[in-house]
Amino acid sequence: MTELLKTPIHPLYAKYGAKTIDFGGWDLPVQFAGIKAEHEAVRTDAGLFDVSHMGEILVKGPDSTSYLQYLLTNDIEKIKIGKAQYNIMCYETGGTVDDLVVYKKSETEYILVVNAANTDKDFEWMVKNIRGDVSVTNVSSEYGQLALQGPSAEKILAKLTDVDLSSISFFGFVEDADVAGVKTIISRSGYTGEDGFEIYMPSADAGKVFEAILAEGVAPIGLGARDTLRLEAVLALYGQELSKDITPLEAGLNFAVKLKKEADFIGKEALIKQKEAGLNRKLVGIELIERGIPRHDYPVFLNEEEIGIVTSGTQSPTLGTNIGLALIDTAYTEIGQEVEVGIRNKKIKAKIVPTPFYKRAK
């Protein structure tokens, strides 16, 4: 059996009562105090996530921008230095290699932050499709990454840094920012639907920053609450809402797919065809009317006919209802449409509802 990978924060998990699981080959905390309490901490105050398992890929060179324009669906030329952009990497078929965030450090240097389980696959795909004068380097092992999320995130982080955090706009970032005596990159971003920051630092210093933030009275948060938070906010998870068989258009990520950008990109032709022909299926929100929790890969029925599958589901700690995302036949995606979810050989009533399930007050 292959030994599980560990983040630089791993030695501290036991001290804070973490219960760990195998997550894509990594030994990561599923919870600390408990999923519901952790979820509520992030929605009402703040919580700290160890996301050091995420991958970082450095792209450098005079042709970096044109290379990324070819590789990614969003318009890279629109990113200013010091800003980040959500992006999708597609196959020729229009299916998804990964979803990721691109940070623009300079006109010739970018960092791509990718899903942990996809890091090697993404890196190989990027190298295989290299064009122009660029270098592509997997620098994942050099970085620790923490996410401080919640309405109190700015107030808490302000105690540990001299950076004027209020000047960092959403998806903006600052380099060489001192946090608890460590040089970091602070990005105003996250995966929870709340305000917050993602902080990148050298791996060796990650534990120091982690403990300095927790010392401010912040709760450590595990993967369980990370999933319920992102699901309420309807943020896609690769392997569930996106995959090699699911295009970003089917997943409702049109805002990150710029079919009109001049640059050709991998998958552009297939995505244009799909859009012109009309989508056969699309991602919708569902809420269960009867008791039961929808889970990944559960079938969705209408009048005995299978019309789709659940991609993600949970009991929503914020709403107190059982919710899910489902990829279903476009003909049946109207709000209010009643469907059934197959749960343990029973068909449980559900209805299609507007998304996101949760949106924070600005």
From Swiss-Prot:
Keyword terms: Aminotransferase, Transferase
E.C. designation(s): 2.1.2.10
Catalytic activity: N(6)-[(R)-S(8)-aminomethyldihydrolipoyl]-L-lysyl-[protein] + (6S)-5,6,7,8-tetrahydrofolate = N(6)-[(R)-dihydrolipoyl]-L-lysyl-[protein] + (6R)-5,10-methylene-5,6,7,8-tetrahydrofolate + NH4(+)
GO biological process, one term: glycine decarboxylation via glycine cleavage system
GO cellular component: cytosol; glycine cleavage complex
Molecular functions per Gene Ontology: aminomethyltransferase activity; transaminase activity
Pfam family, one: GCV_T_C
Quaternary state and interactors: The glycine cleavage system is composed of four proteins: P, T, L and H.
Family annotation (HAMAP family): GcvT
Record-stated family: Belongs to the GcvT family.
Function: The glycine cleavage system catalyzes the degradation of glycine.
Name by which UniProt lists this protein: Aminomethyltransferase
Protein source organism: Listeria monocytogenes serotype 4b (strain F2365)
Organism ancestry: Bacteria, Bacillati, Bacillota, Bacilli, Bacillales
Gene that produces this protein: gcvT
